[in-house]
């Protein structure tokens, strides 16, 4: 039961403050990884596009 309550609170807080979820800043010690972290959401899209390139290479068998 406490797990469900805490999950509900987390979801409720993310609804109230949606910008803090998308624009969170890394701690200063990890600031050098900012470019990598900014690029990470694009990686699944690249795999999706790679599937089409691969299928085109094998003539969509």
Curated annotation (Swiss-Prot):
Which purpose does this protein serve, as stated in its record?
Answer: One of the components of the core complex of photosystem II (PSII). PSII is a light-driven water:plastoquinone oxidoreductase that uses light energy to abstract electrons from H(2)O, generating O(2) and a proton gradient subsequently used for ATP formation. It consists of a core antenna complex that captures photons, and an electron transfer chain that converts photonic excitation into a charge separation.
* Record's subunit section: PSII is composed of 1 copy each of membrane proteins PsbA, PsbB, PsbC, PsbD, PsbE, PsbF, PsbH, PsbI, PsbJ, PsbK, PsbL, PsbM, PsbT, PsbX, PsbY, PsbZ, Psb30/Ycf12, at least 3 peripheral proteins of the oxygen-evolving complex and a large number of cofactors. It forms dimeric complexes.
PANTHER family assigned? PHOTOSYSTEM II REACTION CENTER PROTEIN K, PTHR35325
Where is this gene product found? Plastid, Chloroplast thylakoid membrane
Note the InterPro entries from the entry.
PSII_PsbK, PSII_PsbK_sf
Give the source species. Answer: Oryza sativa subsp. indica (Rice)
Q: What is this protein called?
A: Photosystem II reaction center protein K
Q: What is its main location?
A: plastid
């Amino acid at each position: 039961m406490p797990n469900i309550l805490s999950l509900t609170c987390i979801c409720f807080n993310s609804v109230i403050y949606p910008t803090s979820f998308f624009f969170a800043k890394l701690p200063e010690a990890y600031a050098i990884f900012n470019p990598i972290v900014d690029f990470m959401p694009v990686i699944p899209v690249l795999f999706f596009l790679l599937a089409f390139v691969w299928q085109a290479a094998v003539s969509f068998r």
